[in-house]
């Protein structure tokens, strides 16, 4: 049973995974993988803190009392290295990243020129950042204990950066633990996977995820939403409670420039357009949605097509049950072979969703292909 502190920091559906960990015989590298937005990152940050904790052997880790725990909470632990793209740095223990050179112990890496790179580039971990982080490992532990390097999302590593990481995994520095996270483990190099202990983060069932989400929302002052609206958004976003929470908080704070908020708004417009079937204005839809995260739009399209395929086969929609009437109407007009081919196109597109050239042109091509599903 987890203590109340860890229970509040770790999502309940991840409690069994935490309790299965053997801190006395912890591997030098783990690869935690699972759906985006289900709490993997929060789990891993807490794990890093536990591995760096200097409390007594008999005490639960992290103890939250020792100097190492306090340093970690302020974002200044010298033996913690985080390697995450700019889009994820707000999820780390707080620290003044604005004045840092990239990368430093306890702090995330910045671009060499200190300026934000292009939108898609912000999601990529560069070879320079990776090399500097690995070089920091060779200096030695400041506290005489473990050193922990957290890398997320692992699939965002460029091939040259992944090869640099692979060399360190093949000959790991003493007392160094790699915590690697991936939303799509199939995109991680097999050679990297083979050198890690694989841990699967389970997705919560709908009731569990919604219970957790509603509890978090109840603690936000001034936020008022009906349970029906919360459940609708939860289903639309594929049952990822952490992602839904982030988007609702951003909307509550009226942060219209938040990347997740932009993507959710675009996704809703995209689905409204796709609900028109063969009457979709794919040029207009691409124009009004292409500034959102391409990966987010692709995921929404996949969920819609998955539901449409289910209805075509006589089943029920999983993600958009409120659109069952629309889906049933589309299913009667859909060319099954073209529908299957479109699904394959989406799968192929997701393999390259983070490529710098993934943009409006690709989105237009997919939406045009979608329209043809309902042609004569």
Describe each region flagged by the PLM:
Residues 1-50, 60, 67-68, 174-176, ...:
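Charged, glycine-rich active-site and insertion segments that engage polyanionic ligands
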Residues 1-160:
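Clamp-loader machinery-focused feature within the broader ASCE/P-loop NTPase space
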Residues 32, 151, 165-166, 182:
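Hydrophobic residues in beta-strands of the RecA-like P-loop NTPase core, especially within AAA+ ATPase
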Residues 53, 139, 170-171, 373:
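Conserved amphipathic alpha-helical interaction elements at protein-protein interfaces in regulatory
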Residues 129, 160, 164, 300, ...:
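Charged catalytic carboxylate motif
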Residues 129, 149, 153, 161, ...:
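Helical "lid/switch" subdomain of P-loop NTPase nucleotide-binding domains
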Residues 131-135, 167-170, 214:
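A broadly conserved amphipathic alpha-helix scaffold signal in soluble, globular proteins
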Residues 138, 163-179:
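Conserved catalytic/switch belt of AAA+ P-loop NTPases
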């Amino acid at each position: 049973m987890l203590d109340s502190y860890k229970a509040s920091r770790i999502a309940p559906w991840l409690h069994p995974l935490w309790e299965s960990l053997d801190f006395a015989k912890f591997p030098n590298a783990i690869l935690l993988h699972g759906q985006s937005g289900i709490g993997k990152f929060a789990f891993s940050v807490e794990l890093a803190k536990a591995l760096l904790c200097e409390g007594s052997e008999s005490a639960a880790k992290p103890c939250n009392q020792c100097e190492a725990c306090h340093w970690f909470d302020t974002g200044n632990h010298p033996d913690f290295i985080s390697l995450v793209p700019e889009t994820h740095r707000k999820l780390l223990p707080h620290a003044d990243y604005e004045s840092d050179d990239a990368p430093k112990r306890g702090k995330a890496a910045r671009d060499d020129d200190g300026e934000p790179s292009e939108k898609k580039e912000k999601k990529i971990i560069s070879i320079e950042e990776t090399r500097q982080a690995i070089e920091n490992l060779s200096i030695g532990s400041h506290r005489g204990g473990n050193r922990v390097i957290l890398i997320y999302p692992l699939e965002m590593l460029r091939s040259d950066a992944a090869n640099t990481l692979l060399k360190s995994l093949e000959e790991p520095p003493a007392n160094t633990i790699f915590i690697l996270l991936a939303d799509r483990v199939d995109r991680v190099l097999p050679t990297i996977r083979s050198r890690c202990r694989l841990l699967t983060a389970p997705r919560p069932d709908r009731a569990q995820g919604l219970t957790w989400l509603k509890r978090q929302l109840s603690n936000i002052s001034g936020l008022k939403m009906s349970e029906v609206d919360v459940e609708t958004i939860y289903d639309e976003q594929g049952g990822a409670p952490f992602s839904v929470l982030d988007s609702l908080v951003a909307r509550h704070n009226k942060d219209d420039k938040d990347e997740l908020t932009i993507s959710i708004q675009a996704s809703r417009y995209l689905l409204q357009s796709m609900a028109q079937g063969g009457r979709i204005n794919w040029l207009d839809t691409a124009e009004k949605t292409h500034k959102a995260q391409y990966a987010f739009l692709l995921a929404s399209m996949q969920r819609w097509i998955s539901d449409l395929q289910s209805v075509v086969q006589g089943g029920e929609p999983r993600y958009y049950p409120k659109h069952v009437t629309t889906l049933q109407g589309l299913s009667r007009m859909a060319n099954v072979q073209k529908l299957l081919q479109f699904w394959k196109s989406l799968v192929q597109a997701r393999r390259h969703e983070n490529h710098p050239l993934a943009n409006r042109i690709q989105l237009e091509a997919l939406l045009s292909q979608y329209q043809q599903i309902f042609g004569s």
